[in-house]
From Swiss-Prot:
This is Elongation factor Ts. It is found in: Cytoplasm. Belongs to the EF-Ts family. Keywords: Cytoplasm, Elongation factor, Protein biosynthesis. Residues 82-85 are annotated as: Involved in Mg(2+) ion dislocation from EF-Tu. InterPro entries: EF-Ts_dimer_sf, Transl_elong_EFTs/EF1B, Transl_elong_EFTs/EF1B_dimer, Transl_elong_Ts_CS, UBA-like_sf. SUPFAM superfamilies: Elongation factor Ts (EF-Ts), dimerisation domain (SSF54713), UBA-like (SSF46934). The lineage of its organism: Bacteria, Pseudomonadati, Pseudomonadota, Alphaproteobacteria, Rickettsiales. It comes from Rickettsia felis (strain ATCC VR-1525 / URRWXCal2).
Length: 309
């Protein structure tokens, strides 16, 4: 079959529509004699056949999403291989739909088998999107926050569209305060604080004790090397542990919006103002790709690979 002329504009449009690679889009248009809809189907079929291969590739980009429905909130992370796909409207819609279902599903196993509007399960829908988008996609994780009364604050940092971005945070404030507007505003502020300060726990008692002991050991050895007497070393270590707590424990951190006050002091002031007890029940902070090994690529090599052939 002689190769027909395919315009760069057609290739670009198909890539924007499907998220598939430039060369894949060009080949699809050639194989379908330039028929746009048939080219989309060609990519879908080709992608489904190659889904198993794509599943072996590292997916560390993508999006996190936060969704609040009354007294329930969820955060999900769906990964892709490239940031380019995260800007693809089809992928964004997929993540939004998954987050909406997560509120009802409550666990990731239930979520994976939940039916989407298409009638397919979330897992099946992801496989189909691997076909059209042309990258490995994975539903990596989800977490749920539920409170009996109060307010849930949500914040998404580096949003690409509303509620989708690089960092998603939920904060649940348990309270019977009557002024829900002020309580919700406080929950939102604490969520922004959590995004920026990345606390490891709500209070020191819930902090991983293995982490505390590791820090204590490091501080002890450092103080010992400085040649201090044992009684001084003990005081120095305790002082450094207190400083460590102020850096990683939410209630002891200086509040982002009022740096002279700790989060605990801000909560106490709000309790006085609203005339009700306020408790931080839970927070969730997802940062895209945290803990995933990233594959290092040379940009020049990537461009060369795309333009070859």
């Amino acid at each position: 079959m002689s190769e027909i002329n395919i315009s760069a504009a057609a290739v670009k449009e198909l890539r924007e529509k499907t998220g598939a690679g430039m060369m894949d889009c060009k080949k699809a248009l050639i194989e379908t004699s330039g028929n746009f809809e048939e080219a989309i189907d060609f990519l879908r079929k080709k992608g489904l056949a190659a889904a198993a291969k794509k599943a072996g590739r590292i997916a560390s980009e993508g999006l996190t999403a936060a969704k609040v429905d009354g007294l329930t909130g969820v955060v999900v992370e769906v990964n892709s291989e490239t940031d380019f796909v995260a800007r693809n409207e089809q992928f964004q819609d997929l993540v939004k739909d998954i987050a909406n279902l997560a509120v009802i599903a409550k666990t990731i196993d239930t979520l994976k088998t939940s039916k989407m509007q298409s009638g397919k399960s979330v897992e099946e829908e992801i496989i189909e999107n691997i076909a059209t988008i042309g990258e490995n996609l994975t539903l990596r994780r989800m977490d749920i926050l539920e409170i009996s009364e109060g307010a849930i604050g949500s914040y998404v940092h580096n949003e690409v569209v509303p509620n989708l971005g690089k960092i998603s945070v939920l904060v649940g404030l348990e309270s019977n305060a009557k002024d829900k507007t002020k309580l919700e505003a406080l929950a939102k502020q604490v969520a922004v604080h959590v995004a920026g300060n990345n606390p490891q726990s709500i209070d020191d008692s819930s902090l991983d004790q293995a982490l505390v002991e590791r820090e204590r050991k490091v501080f002890f050895e450092k103080s010992k090397e400085e040649g201090k007497p044992d009684n001084i070393i003990e005081k120095m270590v305790e002082g450094r542990i207190r400083k460590f707590f102020s850096e990683v424990v939410l209630l002891q951190q200086n509040f982002l919006f009022e740096p002279k006050l700790t989060v605990a002091e801000v909560i106490k002031n709000a309790e006085k103002e609203l005339g009700a007890e306020i408790k931080i029940a839970k927070f969730i902070r997802y940062e895209l790709g945290e803990g995933i090994e990233h594959e290092e690529k040379n940009f020049a090599d990537e461009v060369a690979a795309i333009t070859q052939g």
